[in-house]
């Protein structure tokens, strides 16, 4: 578990557990970007081929996209484009490496700027907003 603080006045806790699988395919990163403090968590799907690669590539692609944004960029559009960019990279990687057919990852991204957190997510990795002991918000699996 990591607890991280940033200049954006937020604390982040990321919990990564291997569970019953032979390999932990989680990848996560936090970074100050031009549009806010970004937290990205990806989990390779189902222990399948290339899951660890998929989660790592997705985190890197998302942060690269967010870091290329102008400070005035629309955060919602930036998140949509960042996740789309990661998806395109994963699709191309599978085309280039047929042995990775079926690889994929879940994804949760939050960008905090001031008192606003903008969230994008795909799959069953969750984001929780907690204040004290109360869960204020949780993403729904899809």
PLM-predicted stretches and their roles:
Residues 1-142:
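PP2C/PPM-type serine/threonine phosphatase catalytic domain
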